[in-house]
């Protein structure tokens, strides 16, 4: 279930594919509704859920300045794409037997952030799975530091580019 590093149109990206045992509509709500996003996404998110709609991302504890973004593509309940600062994220869902398949792509600003961000998304997507299963625990970033560190090291061993600063000095 590890993500992969690739280049998309010459830009660095990390990509994940996960299968969840929940219908597309249920997963769609978890990836588009701010109350549910707050349970697994690394920021609280305000979103005007329409193409061109404004997005605002606030970091827990005010550790970083809020970021702005916009919805770039919206095809409910199949595709949700948006900018996050100068980066681009895309979430695609498709039915798969008794559940659905999620494809998550994050086009990055720099190669060096790939291992760091892949580890973070790995934790977040695990958290999404827990949320879908009914575990309303804390959002990523609170108790996930050791889990993130393990994944970060694993991504580096897999040859995913690294070297970007680690928030909090981790």
Predicted feature locations:
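Residue-level signal for tight coil/turn positions that link beta-strands
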Residues: 11, 22, 52, 75-77, ...
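Intrinsic-disorder/low-complexity, polar/charged segments enriched in Ser/Thr/Lys/Arg/Asp/Glu/Gln
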Residues: 13-17, 54, 66, 79, ...
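Residues at helix-coil transition
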Residues: 32-33, 42, 76, 126, ...
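Glycine-rich portal/gate segments that line the openings of hydrophobic small-molecule binding cavities
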Residues: 39-83, 165-170
């Amino acid at each position: 279930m590890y993500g992969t590093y690739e280049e998309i149109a010459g830009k660095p990206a990390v990509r994940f594919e996960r299968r969840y045992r929940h219908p597309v509509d249920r997963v769609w709500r978890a990836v588009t509704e701010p109350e549910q996003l707050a349970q697994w996404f690394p920021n609280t998110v305000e979103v005007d859920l329409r193409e061109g709609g404004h997005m605002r991302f606030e970091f827990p504890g005010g550790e970083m300045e809020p970021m702005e973004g916009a919805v770039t593509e919206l095809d409910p309940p199949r595709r949700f794409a948006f900018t996050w600062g100068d980066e681009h994220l895309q979430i695609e869902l498709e039915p798969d037997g008794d559940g659905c398949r999620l494809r998550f792509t994050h086009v990055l600003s720099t190669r060096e952030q790939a291992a760091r961000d892949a580890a973070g998304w790995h934790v977040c997507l695990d958290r999404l799975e827990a949320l879908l299963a009914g575990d309303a625990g804390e959002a990523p970033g609170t108790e996930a530091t050791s889990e993130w560190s393990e994944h970060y090291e694993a991504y580096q061993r897999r040859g995913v580019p690294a070297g970007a600063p680690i928030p909090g000095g981790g």
